[in-house]
Curated annotation (Swiss-Prot):
<comment type="similarity">
    <text>Belongs to the UPF0344 family.</text>
</comment>
<protein>
    <recommendedName>
        <fullName>UPF0344 protein SH1980</fullName>
    </recommendedName>
</protein>
<keyword id="KW-0472">Membrane</keyword>
<feature type="transmembrane region" description="Helical">
    <location>
        <begin position="1"/>
        <end position="21"/>
    </location>
</feature>
<dbReference type="GO" id="GO:0005886">
    <property type="term" value="C:plasma membrane"/>
</dbReference>
<keyword id="KW-1133">Transmembrane helix</keyword>
<dbReference type="Pfam" id="PF07457">
    <property type="entry name" value="DUF1516"/>
</dbReference>
<keyword id="KW-0812">Transmembrane</keyword>
<feature type="transmembrane region" description="Helical">
    <location>
        <begin position="71"/>
        <end position="91"/>
    </location>
</feature>
<keyword id="KW-1003">Cell membrane</keyword>
<dbReference type="InterPro" id="IPR010899">
    <property type="entry name" value="UPF0344"/>
</dbReference>
<feature type="transmembrane region" description="Helical">
    <location>
        <begin position="42"/>
        <end position="62"/>
    </location>
</feature>
<feature type="transmembrane region" description="Helical">
    <location>
        <begin position="103"/>
        <end position="123"/>
    </location>
</feature>
């Protein structure tokens, strides 16, 4: 499940950047925008569902004596939901020809924060590198 989550958010980020760039400031969305947006939404849902499933698994492991870090897990969940919301809002604003570059960069910064939290959490690469779980 962890690999599916990582693959889904990686594809979500790539699709977000491509979809954002497929909206021209003067002409609006290109013909490829609609399928890109639909694929982006599918991968957003897949990312949210797999992340929620990983959260449940970690909470269950913590209740049986292993794991922990409930606060960081909850913060990562909230950041993930905020990333998805910012992706949708920035694309909607760009389609309406409103200022959206600030939201785009806020989304990128929040993606980096969310990924950083994922790296240091119990199933992340840093934790497995040092045998912390």
């Amino acid at each position: 499940m962890l690999h599916m989550h990582i693959a889904s958010w990686a594809l979500t980020i790539i699709l977000y950047v491509i979809a954002f760039l497929h909206i021209s400031k003067s002409q609006g969305p290109t013909p490829m925008f609609k399928p890109l947006q639909m694929a982006l939404r599918v991968f957003m849902l897949l990312t949210l569902f797999s992340g929620f499933w990983l959260l449940i698994q970690e909470f269950m492991a913590a209740s049986h004596g292993g794991g922990g870090n409930h606060m960081l897990l909850t913060l990562k969940m909230l950041c993930g939901i905020a990333v998805v919301a910012l992706m949708e809002v920035s694309i909607a604003k760009r389609k309406k020809h409103e200022a959206s570059h600030g939201l785009f960069w806020a989304t990128i910064i929040l993606i980096i924060i969310t990924m950083s939290l994922g790296i240091i959490l119990p199933w992340g690469p840093i934790s497995s590198l040092f045998g912390i779980s």
